[in-house]
């Protein structure tokens, strides 16, 4: 029997779970107060806060790190890699600390995992990190050669959805063309060709705005803001990732609260909420063009897929493209667990980063 601890840092929470083989023993979603997170200038500064919360959770649940077979974490913005399971080695750890691929809560996963595991010599793995890159060359070109488009997405859940759909429908992944829209604190809309993510908006910088990210912005106006003298570099980064989207417009990243406001007659909340759904649907349409209309299904997943009002707007706009499949929430925890178990059972050889 293998004991596996799974750690999945998100924008405003850290999901943790203990498994004995495939059996879930305990699972929690440790929520971090938005106002508290605002006090941190960067994601890396949240390390002690999140590590303390996890240690408290471990203690409350009587979990001893020494008894674990492995820790597996959600991967962060490292250098571009192929899909698969990786050892969180020193090279990856350094790149996560530096944020070589950018700022993202998942950068903390490997750092937290190693902080817990190193005193006991326990292996730490990551699976299908945000930096998974399968984009076609034509999708990388932007209007400036200095600024190529990069593949950064919620690859873990996107890949889990591909695996699940293929399994449930008795289909081969390499024969599947589909669109997967992961909708959470950040939003990734991916074109899947032959099971590969051939194009995707960069959830930190492009595409639809989300509960706390701006998505694509009018570039000239962004330049003007940067040179206005009103904002530092870090303040501008925070505006785009962390303080954008619903947070910027409505002061909350909770779509459920926004829906309550709408039901209470808040017209601004209604307009902003509909705009977010509109932009998600528009991005799905863009990805349908990438696949030349050959779309088996459109999968809507992530926490926002629980929002019936949001889903209704999206389906109304893109239902003509392909049948809609709903996988609300995400299979990220199970996907991470399964990756670690495959390695522990000798079914897969972990890849080495760097």
Curated annotation (Swiss-Prot):
The keyword Iron does not apply. The keyword ATP-binding applies. GO terms for molecular function: acetate kinase activity; ATP binding; butyrate kinase activity. Its main location: cytoplasm. PROSITE patterns: ACETATE_KINASE_1, ACETATE_KINASE_2. Its EC number is 2.7.2.7. This is Probable butyrate kinase 2. It comes from Caldanaerobacter subterraneus subsp. tengcongensis (strain DSM 15242 / JCM 11007 / NBRC 100824 / MB4) (Thermoanaerobacter tengcongensis).
């Amino acid at each position: 029997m293998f004991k596996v601890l799974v750690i999945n840092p998100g924008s405003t929470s850290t999901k943790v779970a203990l498994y004995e083989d495939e059996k879930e023993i305990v699972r929690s979603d440790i929520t971090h107060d938005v106002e508290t997170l605002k006090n941190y200038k960067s994601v890396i500064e949240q390390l002690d806060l999140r590590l303390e919360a996890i240690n408290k959770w471990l203690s409350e649940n009587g979990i001893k790190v020494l008894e674990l077979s492995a820790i597996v974490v959600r991967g962060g913005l490292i250098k571009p890699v192929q899909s698969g399971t990786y050892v969180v080695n020193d090279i990856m750890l350094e790149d996560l600390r530096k944020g070589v691929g950018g700022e993202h809560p998942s950068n903390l996963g490997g750092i937290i995992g190693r902080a817990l595991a190193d005193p006991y010599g326990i292996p730490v793995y990551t699976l299908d990190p945000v930096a998974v890159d399968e984009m076609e060359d034509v999708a990388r070109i932007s209007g400036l050669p200095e600024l190529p488009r990069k593949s950064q997405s919620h690859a873990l859940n996107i890949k889990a959805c591909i695996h699940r759909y293929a399994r449930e429908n008795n289909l081969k992944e390499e024969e599947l063309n589909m669109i997967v829209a992961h909708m959470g604190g950040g939003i990734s809309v991916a074109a899947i060709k032959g099971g590969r993510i051939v194009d995707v908006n960069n959830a930190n910088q492009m595409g639809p705005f989300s509960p706390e990210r701006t998505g694509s912005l009018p570039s000239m106006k962004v330049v003007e803001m940067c040179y206005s003298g009103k904002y530092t570099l870090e303040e501008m980064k925070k505006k785009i990732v962390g303080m954008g989207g619903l947070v910027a417009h409505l002061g909350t990243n909770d779509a459920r609260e926004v829906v309550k406001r709408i039901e209470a007659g808040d017209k601004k909340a209604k307009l902003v909420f509909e705009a977010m759904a509109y932009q998600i649907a528009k991005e799905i349409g863009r990805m349908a063009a990438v696949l030349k209309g050959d779309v088996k299904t459109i999968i809507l997943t992530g926490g926002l897929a629980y929002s019936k009002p949001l889903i209704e707007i999206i389906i109304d706009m893109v239902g003509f493209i392909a049948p809609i499949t709903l996988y609300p929430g995400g299979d990220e925890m199970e996907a991470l667990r399964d990756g670690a178990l495959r390695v522990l059972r000798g079914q897969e050889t972990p890849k080495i980063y760097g």
